[in-house]
A protein has these predicted regions:
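N-terminal glycine-rich, Lys/His-bearing helix-loop that initiates the first secondary-structure elements
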Residues: 1-157
Length: 157
């Protein structure tokens, strides 16, 4: 089993930053001080044992037909070169952990980086921290000359 981290936004960013977020929520009227503080300190389990077990169980189903295939002729509007290279059968219909259900109804293993989050897996429970940050008013703008606290913190780590 993997070591499961359980952290809050406050654990990651520190109390000084959280105090500013909480006061900002109160000023903007988006959350009460108490609600904002509770959200900032909510512990999120990054990779709970139940998720680990489910990922292990799904391995036996890789390559098998799981759901009915999507029989849709929607090819979008790609370039000819892209249309020739794409694999619509494997296009994601749904995903969980390191698995993806293709439009052909088969289960695929993410065996290589499909995107930046592949190492975390689809539906990574730790993404709840992003939802919490958004509710607390953390902006997602990260312009070069006004990089936010969290961006600067990540640069150092």
């Amino acid at each position: 089993m993997f070591r499961n981290l359980t952290l809050s936004l406050a654990d990651i960013t520190g109390e000084d930053y959280i105090r500013g977020l909480v006061e900002g929520c109160e000023f903007f009227g988006t959350l009460s001080r108490g609600d904002a503080d509770a959200l900032a300190h909510e512990k999120i389990s990054f990779y709970p044992e139940a998720v680990q077990r489910r990922n292990d169980e799904l391995a036996a189903s890789v390559g098998r037909q799981i759901v009915s295939a999507v029989n849709d002729s929607n090819g979008g509007a790609p370039t000819d070169a892209f249309r020739h290279a794409e694999n619509r059968d494997a296009s994601p219909l749904g995903a969980y952990g390191c698995y993806r259900l293709g439009e052909d109804g088969k289960l695929y293993l993410i065996g290589k980086s499909e995107h930046y989050h592949a190492s975390l897996g689809h539906s990574f429970p730790g993404y709840r921290l992003v939802d919490i940050a958004r509710r607390l008013g953390v902006p997602n703008a990260t312009h070069n000359n006004t990089r936010g606290y969290i961006t600067r913190l990540c640069e150092k780590r």
